[in-house]
Amino acid sequence: MKHIVYQVLPRLWGNGRFSAWNESAFRYLSTLGVDCIWFTGVPRHASGKPFVKGDPGCPYSISDWKDVNPYLADNPDSRMAEFENLVARCHKAGFKVLIDYIPNHVACDYQGDVRHFDYCDGDWTDTLKNDWSDPRTFEAMLDILRFWLSKGVDGFRCDMVELVPADALRGLISALKAENPETIFVAEVYGKENYSLYSESVGFDLLYDKSGMYDSLRAICCNGYTARSLTWNWQWLGRLQPQMINFLENHDEQRAASREFLGSAPRGYAALAASLLFNTASFLLYFGQEVGENASEGAQGRTSIFNWCRPVSIGRLVDSVESGKRLPKAEAAVLRKYRELLGYAQLDAFSKGNVWDLCYCNYDSRGFDADRHFAFLRYDDSSAWLVVCNFSDRPADMSIAIPVEVQSACGCSCKAVCVDPWDAAVVRLK
């Protein structure tokens, strides 16, 4: 199933509390085709201590795995009940709820049953590395995940899984899937050589394709790398394509519209179309991305996960969602484009249909540049669509040849297409 996941730090949305997620917010996400909400920063993390990074601190430095952050509640004494109410509201509105699971480390002030060493990985100085050689850690983690499932959570985005024994993760997923088969497990994986292991052996439902699709798109857009790399990536993935989750942004990566990445949201439309529409892989949308949030208030093009901040465009987006206040023209235009492309992703031909990379048969086609253009078909029994992405500063006017093998599915053998710079054209053929 092609999921559209919306990642959000609830402390930076609206009033910064669970209560900000109301019918207006859910209606808004429905217009984007979102079906899963990943709430980042729910389990209680370290805050206000000398070792903590920032104020209120990092969501990945967990001090109590069976509590939620008090600052997310209207009444801190009722914070867990307020979280359960949030989950119930999400379910009523038709959304699944994901939270973070961090198996590699805990906060320096962690109190609980997970066994850990007295050192950290790298510069994660607000954490201590977990000791998975102690069987009590596995039992404690299984209990923690069961706890969150009992609260109604539908799945987990699992942090830095390559730093944890694969056998331990396999055991956790197997045990929990036996009890709750629909539980979703998303793996943050960076080594492409490990994709098959974590998908087919360990049992994750979705894997980050950061080292494939994301890195390829970034190299194409920022470094002039050839668009042929998109073909090479799916050929390498093969049968694993549906198990990937693609993205242009998340909390670890720079905002696409930041000066450190693309410089503007419109310059990312071609990359968005390729990442979102090429195959049945799921897609992750980071809050504010859809209006061109550029993290201008933060460092290095990232919205801070350590400090209180108020990204300006996210504030305007929330005002628009809650009160109907108009967005500035530029942000409204970005949102329209995102809604357009996300709308295509909901169609059967895109969400579960067939894909045909057209680049190989268009090297000599009029106007087609295999290094700067990417063209493909999405089709099923009822419709066929041509998508052409233009990764260049110049408008592209081209004729795209349709190979004989899929002409009956498309109803044509050739199609003329015009695509603006850094944009994508989506054309219905049938």
Label each PLM-derived region with a short phrase.
Residues 394-411:
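Beta-strand-rich binding/interaction modules
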Residues 4-6, 37-39, 97-99, 156, ...:
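Hydrophobic faces of well-ordered beta-strands that scaffold small-molecule active sites
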Residues 34, 150-153, 204, 280:
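A structural motif
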Residues 2-36, 41-151, 172-180, 194-196:
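Substrate-binding/active-site clefts of carbohydrate-active enzymes
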Residues 8, 29, 39, 65, ...:
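Conserved, mostly hydrophobic/aromatic
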Residues 415-430:
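C-terminal beta-strand-rich structural cap/linker in extracellular carbohydrate-active enzymes
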Residues 47, 250, 255-399:
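Loop/helix patches that line or flank the sugar-binding groove of alpha-linked glycan CAZymes
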Residues 143-146, 159-244, 261, 265, ...:
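Active-site-proximal helices and loops of the catalytic beta/alpha 8
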